[in-house]
């Protein structure tokens, strides 16, 4: 018996990506695009001072953003105390959890906005949640996870974003 498969996928999208048209940062402006370029081999970072530990994404369209998805340098062991704003309204505040990659930060109910701002609110701290777990991979696989970042384990007022994705629920939950 041969089963015929439909031409449509077997799933339905429940979220859509809100595109960024540009970004403004507290410093290293030329690298800001690296935080939303869909490459896990690049990053944006500030210069280690609290006054420059922020980045603002201008959206390609005015839209409601329901979730910010971040991959932060040091994801396996570093917690970043952040605030997230839609335009000038605070919609998320807390410490990012350590993870094995991306963290999903659901935002408080928000209205359509033209920008999203992410600000570091204090010193990042280390966690030993994953202890001595080792990954078998080529040495470069861990470079953005603080293993090869020069003095990356010593800087606490540094905000380092590998990837930022802004999502909207197609049907709000």
Language-model segments: what does each one mean?
Residues 67, 115-117:
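Short, conserved beta-strand segments of beta-strand-rich sandwich/propeller modules, principally
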Residues 95-100:
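Short proline/glycine- and polar residue-rich coil/turn motifs
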Residues 57, 101-109:
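Exposed aromatic-hydrophobic patches
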